[in-house]
């Protein structure tokens, strides 16, 4: 790594630590020529993939869009932002690990619903009402009955 102060390439790593859910590595370095210290951050470059929307159009996967939809479902619920970020990262890494270059939105929606079901039942119903395009009160009754049956089993 080139020193930003003297442009020499003789540097040494003094300290390394993983940050942000182990997807970044922060390294403290020292230049062996001018003795300046500086910090670098390494990030794993993940492959990008596309999302196939219900109307057949494709668009690049947007992690922020996924986070926003989950934040809407969990608004004013006793769910930590840390828990939501972990969920978003887990979904992202699972999708990123798939062999396909394009993933349908229903696969992503199912993953979100599975995670929300474990995390918060009210957020699950909120998300389901949009994702499953609820038309009337019976749709809500059906999903709530499903939750009650799952808790009994």
UniProtKB/Swiss-Prot annotation:
Function: Negatively regulates transcription of bacterial ribonucleotide reductase nrd genes and operons by binding to NrdR-boxes.
Recorded family membership: Belongs to the NrdR family.
Zinc finger region(s), unnamed: 3-34
Origin organism lineage: Bacteria, Pseudomonadati, Pseudomonadota, Alphaproteobacteria, Rickettsiales
Domain of life, source organism: Bacteria
Single annotated GO MF: DNA binding
Cofactor(s) needed by this chain: Zn(2+)
InterPro entries: ATP-cone_dom (IPR005144), NrdR-like_N (IPR055173), RNR_NrdR-like (IPR003796)
A GO biological process held by the record: negative regulation of DNA-templated transcription
Stated name of the protein: Transcriptional repressor NrdR
UniProt entry tagged with the keyword ATP-binding: yes
DNA-binding found in the keyword field: yes
Bound cofactor: record note: Binds 1 zinc ion.
Cross-referenced NCBIfam families: transcriptional regulator NrdR
Keyword list, A-Z: ATP-binding, DNA-binding, Metal-binding, Nucleotide-binding, Repressor, Transcription, Transcription regulation, Zinc, Zinc-finger
Annotated Pfam families: ATP-cone, Zn_ribbon_NrdR
Species of origin: Ehrlichia canis (strain Jake)
UniProt domain ATP-cone: residue ranges: 49-139
């Amino acid at each position: 790594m080139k020193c930003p102060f003297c442009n020499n390439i003789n540097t040494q790593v003094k300290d390394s630590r993983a940050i942000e859910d182990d997807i970044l590595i922060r390294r403290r370095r020292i230049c062996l020529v001018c003795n300046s210290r500086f910090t670098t951050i390494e990030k794993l470059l993940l492959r990008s993939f596309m999302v196939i929307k219900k109307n057949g159009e494709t668009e690049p996967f947007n992690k922020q869009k996924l986070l926003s939809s989950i934040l809407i479902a969990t608004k004013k619920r006793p769910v930590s932002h840390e828990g939501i970020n972990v969920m978003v990262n887990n979904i992202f890494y699972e999708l990123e690990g798939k062999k396909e270059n394009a993933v349908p939105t229903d696969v992503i929606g199912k993953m979100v619903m599975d995670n929300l079901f474990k995390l918060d039942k009210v957020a699950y119903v909120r998300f389901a009402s949009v994702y499953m395009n609820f038309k009337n009160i019976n749709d809500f009754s059906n999903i709530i009955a499903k939750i009650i049956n799952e808790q009994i089993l």
